[in-house]
Amino acid sequence: GWHDAGDYDLRVESQAGEAYILAMACENFGAYWDETSIDFEKRIVEIHQPDGKNDLLQQVENGALTVVAGWKALGRLYRGILCPTVRQYAHLGDASAHTDHVSGTADDRWVFTEDNPGRELQVAAWLAGISRVLKGHNDTLAADCLEIARELFKITRCDNNWILTTKVHAAVELYLATKEAGYRDFVLQQQDFICKNIRQTGWFIGRFDQAVGNVRFSKAIRKALPELQAMYQEYSSKTPYGVPHDRGNRSSGSWEPQHLGYNYCYLHAAYPDLFTPDYIFNAVQYLLGMHPGRNQAAFVTGVGAETMKAAYGVNRADWSY
């Protein structure tokens, strides 16, 4: 799994969610990059040493392994894997130095669980998507991801709109992974809900719409999409950058442009007549510092209008977070 920058927690949504995003980059764009050697068994990573394997798929593996291992150990998803003391949290240096690696001593990390159906179904959606791209790269892990996604979809209760939204997303990803009629029929049965909640469902429903080709369903979705189109137009008008930098989440000025731009890519791909590519370019240009204003620092290390000297990393001693 991955740590946040300057943070020593591993959250299940960070692990599965990031692995899913990278998986979708591979699936939709054929993204390939090989500049790193990664040996999971020996726990060795060497940068600038290609190993003949797609780095993106190896990163997908990295995220999936921690989620699958947690499931196999606990029989459920973990919520977070955290260092137990404030002193460890404020640690300067590599995370591996938190512990003496001897089981049972007080420096071991704690594993937290929770009863959160929405998050569990969200992870089910992500694992189903991950399973598709891991086929042929790590077939055992791909099968584990799909099996866990199926089980979570089957056993997780659904009693509010957010949970149902995540269940529909899980069904979409499971259908795309398996082509099984049960998942297809579940999504089709939720047509009215999907249309009423198009702001939340629109970004992921297009791939299903195209894959299934149900005329009645397609007409209903297209009728609902102008509401989502208007939402993005409203967001674009809120700042000189063409993207909102903040919708209440003040912990990072890059999350909203990334999240909304990523979702918009799927809307443009599925319905290009309704969603022009402009918003995608606005999001990318904002992240690269190519926008009005004095501060044109890029959010991505090494590229953009003005690149920051400090690399983005986890070690607080490097001031890299």
Which role fits each region the language model picked out?
Residues 1-16, 25, 50, 83-133, ...:
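Aromatic (Trp/Tyr) and acidic
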Residues 19-26, 39, 44:
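General structural concept
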Residues 22-29, 64, 71, 127, ...:
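Sec/Tat-exported extracytoplasmic proteins
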Residues 30-33, 78-82, 136, 298-302:
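Short, solvent-exposed loop/turn and secondary-structure capping segments
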Residues 33-42, 76-80, 141-144:
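Short, glycine/acidic-rich hinge or "gate" loops at secondary-structure transitions
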Residues 42-59, 141:
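Acidic, glycine-anchored loop motifs typical of Ca2+
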Residues 55-82:
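Carboxylate/His-rich catalytic cores and anion/metal-binding grooves
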Residues 145-178, 186, 190-193, 198:
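Beta-propeller domains
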